[in-house]
Amino acid sequence: IVMYGIQAIIKLRLQVWRALLIGIIIFIALNGTFFLRNYSAFQHPLAPDTTLQNTFIGIQPIATNTVKNLAMHFLSPWPAINNVVTSIVIKYHQFIHTDINDPRFSWEFSPPFSASQLYPHEDYATAPFYILFFLIACAYLLFNMRKHSWKISIYALVIISMWLTFSLLLKWQVWHCRLHLPMLLASTPLIAFYLNNCRKSVRIVSIVVFILFALPSIFYNYSRPIIGKNSIFTNSKYDQYFFNQPTNQKPFFDISAIMQRNNLKNIGWIISGDSWEYPMWVLLNDETHLRMEHILVKNATQKFEDASFIPDGIINKMIEPDSLGRIYYHNTIYQVVYENDPWMFMQKVGD
């Protein structure tokens, strides 16, 4: 932003305020409602979660996390190559005298760093050729700066600063590859610029390589494959909601059936922050006057809980009922009527 701001001042001069105003309006239009929501809940526009932030800001988190973030994109179907990548990253950390899994820079709930086998899953998808061509494009610009407009060099610096800022602020975790997507997309014009300055044969080979290596993730994608027994063309949309967590399918179908059979319209949820909820909205999409609320919330959003809400039933994944299979909420007794570990459905006694 700073780099493009300087460029705008140089180019537009007195008209820069018009461009600045347009930029501010676009920024507020895209992010304003999220900032307001976060501020109302956390008294901070960015809803800070210190568990995901590096313990301190400095060179060390950049040095370790940038390398690990980039290395994760070089996974391959061949264990020998993955072992080489892992070995290089380990030796690099030994050289800089930093623990590769230092808890100050690695999220505690993430598995330790390892360049294991390539996995065509939306949570772990990698982009090795994007990273490789981005690095080559940066090297090309470095050695040919005088041949091209300084604007493209600034653009490259912006993308590099995005990677460094990402590594500076966030603890490394194995699921970071999916969060790199904005930076990968931003690097596309730079890669195209580099290929445009290559021989035609290089461009053709590069395009073919990109396409060929994209096909396995399309056809054999774990979550939404085109072919195979889980093909998106041979499975219902309801089945596809549970491809990533198939053990949730039966309890969700069973609980939704109980709710519909007993005409239960007010449902409370007692679940963790990482638990699924949205498939239930899909299964009950045809229900009218349906209301579902989170209850017994223990985080910063607890103040938004509606104390007047008395659910007809409770979907419970967090609280252990008493010896009689009951819990109490707002002086009302709820009895377990269905259980499929870890899910329980509890109905108000008397209904």
Where are these regions (language model features)?
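Aromatic-rich transmembrane-lumenal/periplasmic boundary elements in polytopic membrane proteins
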Residues: 31-95
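Hydrophobic/aromatic-rich transmembrane helices and adjacent perimembrane loops
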Residues: 1, 43, 130, 160-165, ...
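Membrane-proximal, lumen/periplasm-facing interface regions of secretory-pathway glyco-
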Residues: 206-260, 273-278
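Signature aromatic-anchored transmembrane alpha helix within multi-pass, membrane-resident enzymes
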Residues: 2-5, 9, 16-28, 148-149, ...
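Aromatic/acidic, Gly/Pro-rich catalytic loop(s) in extracytoplasmic/lumenal soluble domains
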Residues: 300-351
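Membrane-interface anchor segments at the N-terminal boundary of transmembrane helices
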Residues: 81-156
